[in-house]
């Protein structure tokens, strides 16, 4: 018999039903479960696939550069970043005739184009790119890296070049190389690029390979470095009247500590950014020399972890046994990596708008909104993934003997306390927050808005004040605002920081009030509930009081028959599945809050947010309905405009989202009956019955149908909000 898909599982390949195809796709990347897999092949396959991943990333970023160079308007955008709309790429075939062609021909283009809301124009401009030729060069370089990555991936699958398992498990060498090489050297290289290329470009100096060695980034060259007069590099920074990209008002400093924003670009000072990367490089280069490898000096990870035993003996054996547990479990390592990356991605969302690093991006409101929302959603998916792999670790890799009485074992032993406390926190937050919103809603509905319960977030305002924000008047607590102590306290802050934090036109430390207090607690409810579901899923993955032998059923079992009082919906996979809905829900609240607060800030009517955000009808009417007006006006006498495509996507997103429920709220019997009826009709229809198939059609399993439903729900939800966000923001601000 010819080899059938999937080749990695002979059992599945012989399945006579369509289950073969779906289960084959579902387990294609679960290398551990494949036939003939060994630990060595598992590590080697994953290692090689990383190079493939890198190749795809380099190809994709190369495509961004290439399409902007070919079809974009980068050179004209550089001349006037605030008024020219950046073009992402052309639209080959604008449907719906001449009106569509006219609607989508903008940004100075000759034909229909898409506008870029990704911030790449601002990024490339900030790092010193100025011409289409620069973009093409970058695209070619990334293509070259992509090819190198593919070759490396192929090479490391050849017998001679396959690394051994011991190489993969050499934690100290990997730490040293990743800390020094990945973070240290790359940060140092980036500092070099900023100092040698980007900062000169911001001062009107065009540095490329042909004059790279002739143009000194600083008038005194390396002199101050070798004579120890490093402060000279910070003297004479760009003035507040500096015009970015020109020599007008430019200084000579390359490494500064100014704080705050460049007045014209509203972004962080490039010289501050270079200084930051140099400091990061120094720290990581040192950190990458701390672990013991061939030279017998430095820390051993195993010794470090084994030494971490809490004194007094009341907290067990601390980190004993963790080294082997983590080093031998890919799921544990992936869980840690995803948890870290998820947090960092959310921090990127937060910092990209509050402390913008790229020139003029703060004035491109649609891009700001798109980037914030994008990074928060990505963070949500990555963080839920961390718990999924944590649960798989407990099922497949956790060894109770090896971890006796250490922190891992103790987490499992007192899991009831953890889960019940999280549950209590979620219930408290949910009922109190909803209670306040509903009370305020009713007061508005009955025409007595003065009876709302409005709570000032005094602790958050105090924290903002402690960081130099003066508008709340917390200095009323001081005996004197002109004393030496007060003045000395002001000098702690960088001068630019105090200006920025008290300037109401940026997004740094936004002024907050009762509406913020409420939505903050709604978001806290979402975060705690999502965490509750995820933590419970991982801690109960091995077993619970109801089902002590759960680990024997694997990660994603649907049910264990009719016994035990019902065991459906309690696999670790089910917890992940439920948590994703809560995650999406939470990020919905986060992005609604961010977007509405910023729309009112940018339009100069912050009182709309402040007054309407304290009750539910305000959110529904003054945020969602008011801002979706351009998307739901259907056919009108004015025909097509450039928002029409978003209106269509808004509708389509709702359709995809609603389709999710078809899979989520119906069970296998319905689908099996439907499929058999369709197959019966097919076999009796002339012409159609010439097409035959070998696999007997069967319905998706319960778990698969849930996955399909979840995928439609998630994709539809995000599509819908993306269309709403981009259309409502670009409709107002361009």
Swiss-Prot record:
GO molecular function: 4 iron, 4 sulfur cluster binding; chlorophyll binding; electron transfer activity; magnesium ion binding; oxidoreductase activity
Catalysis performed (reactions): reduced [plastocyanin] + hnu + oxidized [2Fe-2S]-[ferredoxin] = oxidized [plastocyanin] + reduced [2Fe-2S]-[ferredoxin]
EC number(s) from the headed UniProt entry: 1.97.1.12
Claim: Electron transport is one of the keywords in the record: yes
Top enzyme class: oxidoreductase
Co-factor remark: P700 is a chlorophyll a/chlorophyll a' dimer, A0 is one or more chlorophyll a, A1 is one or both phylloquinones and FX is a shared 4Fe-4S iron-sulfur center.
Membrane topology reported for the UniProt record: Multi-pass membrane protein
Source organism superkingdom: Eukaryota
Subunit structure: The PsaA/B heterodimer binds the P700 chlorophyll special pair and subsequent electron acceptors. PSI consists of a core antenna complex that captures photons, and an electron transfer chain that converts photonic excitation into a charge separation. The eukaryotic PSI reaction center is composed of at least 11 subunits.
Similarity field: Belongs to the PsaA/PsaB family.
Name the UniProt record assigns to this protein: Photosystem I P700 chlorophyll a apoprotein A2
Biological source species: Nicotiana tabacum
């Amino acid at each position: 018999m010819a080899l059938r898909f999937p080749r990695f599982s002979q059992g599945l390949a012989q399945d006579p039903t369509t289950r073969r195809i779906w289960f084959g796709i579902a387990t294609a990347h679960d290398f551990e479960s494949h036939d003939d897999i060994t630990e060595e092949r598992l590590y080697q396959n994953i290692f090689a696939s990383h190079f493939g991943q890198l190749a795809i990333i380099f190809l994709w970023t190369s495509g961004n550069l290439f399409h902007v160079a070919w079809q974009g308007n980068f050179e004209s955008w550089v001349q006037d970043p605030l008024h020219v709309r950046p073009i992402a790429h052309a639209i080959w075939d604008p449907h719906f005739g001449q009106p569509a062609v006219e609607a989508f021909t903008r940004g100075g283009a000759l034909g229909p184009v898409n506008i870029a809301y990704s911030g790449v124009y601002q990024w490339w401009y900030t790092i010193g790119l100025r011409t289409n030729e620069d973009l093409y060069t970058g695209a070619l370089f990334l293509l070259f890296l992509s090819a190198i990555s593919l070759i490396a991936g192929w090479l490391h699958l050849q017998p001679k070049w396959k690394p051994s398992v011991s190489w993969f498990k050499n934690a100290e060498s990997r730490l040293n190389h990743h800390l020094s090489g990945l973070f240290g050297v790359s940060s140092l290289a980036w500092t070099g690029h900023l100092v040698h290329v980007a900062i000169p470009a911001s001062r009107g100096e065009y540095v490329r390979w042909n004059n790279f060695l002739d143009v000194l980034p600083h008038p005194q060259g390396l002199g101050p470095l070798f004579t120890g007069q490093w402060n000279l590099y910070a003297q004479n920074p760009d003035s507040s009247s500096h015009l970015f990209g020109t020599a007008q008002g430019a200084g000579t400093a390359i490494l500064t500590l100014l704080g705050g924003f460049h007045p014209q670009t509203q972004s962080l000072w490039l010289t501050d950014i270079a200084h930051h990367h140099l400091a990061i490089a120094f720290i990581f280069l040192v950190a990458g020399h701390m672990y013991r490898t061939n030279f017998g000096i430095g820390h051993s990870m195993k010794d470090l972890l084994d030494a971490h035993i809490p004194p007094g003996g009341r907290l067990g054996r601390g980190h004993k046994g963790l080294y082997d547990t983590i080093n031998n479990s890919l799921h544990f390592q992936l869980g840690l990596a995803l948890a870290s990356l998820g947090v960092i991605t959310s921090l990127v969302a937060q910092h990209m708008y509050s402390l913008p690093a790229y020139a003029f991006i703060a004035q491109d409101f649609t891009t700001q909104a798109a980037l914030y929302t994008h990074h928060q959603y990505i963070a949500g998916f990555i963080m839920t993934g961390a718990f999924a792999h944590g649960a798989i670790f407990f099922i497949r890799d956790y060894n109770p003997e090896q971890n006796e009485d250490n922190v891992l074992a103790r987490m499992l032993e007192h899991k009831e306390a953890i889960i019940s406390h999280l549950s209590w926190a979620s219930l408290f937050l949910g009922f109190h927050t909803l209670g306040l919103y509903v009370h305020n809603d009713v007061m508005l509905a009955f025409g007595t808005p003065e009876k709302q319960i409005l709570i000032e977030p005094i602790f958050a305002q105090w924290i903002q004040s402690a960081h130099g924000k003066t508008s709340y008047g917390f200095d009323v607590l001081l005996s004197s605002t002109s004393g030496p102590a007060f003045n000395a306290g002001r000098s702690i802050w960088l001068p630019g920081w105090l200006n920025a934090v008290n300037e109401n036109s940026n997004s740094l430390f936004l002024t907050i009030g009762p509406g913020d207090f409420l939505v903050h607690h709604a978001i806290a409810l979402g975060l705690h509930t999502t965490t509750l579901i995820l933590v419970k899923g991982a801690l109960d993955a091995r077993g619970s009081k109801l089902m002590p032998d759960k680990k024997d059923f694997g990660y994603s079992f649907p049910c264990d028959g009719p016994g035990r009082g019902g065991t459906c919906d309690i696999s670790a996979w089910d917890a992940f599945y439920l948590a994703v809905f809560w995650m999406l829900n939470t990020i919905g609240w986060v992005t609604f809050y961010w977007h509405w607060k910023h729309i009112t800030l940018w339009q100069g009517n912050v009182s709309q947010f402040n007054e309407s955000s304290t009750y539910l009808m305000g959110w529904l009417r003054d945020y969602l309905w008011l801002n979706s007006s351009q998307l739901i006006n259907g056919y009108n006498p004015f025909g097509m405009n450039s928002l029409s495509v978003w209106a269509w996507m808004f509708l389509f997103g709702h359709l995809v989202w609603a389709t999710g429920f078809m899979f989520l709220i119906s069970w296998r019997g319905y689908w099996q009956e439907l499929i058999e009826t369709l197959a019966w009709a097919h076999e009796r229809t002339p012409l159609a019955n010439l097409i035959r198939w070998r696999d007997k059609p069967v319905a998706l399993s319960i778990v698969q149908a849930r996955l399909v439903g979840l995928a439609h729900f998630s994709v539809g939800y995000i599509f819908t909000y993306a269309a709403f966000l981009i259309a409502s923001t670009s409709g107002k601000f361009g």
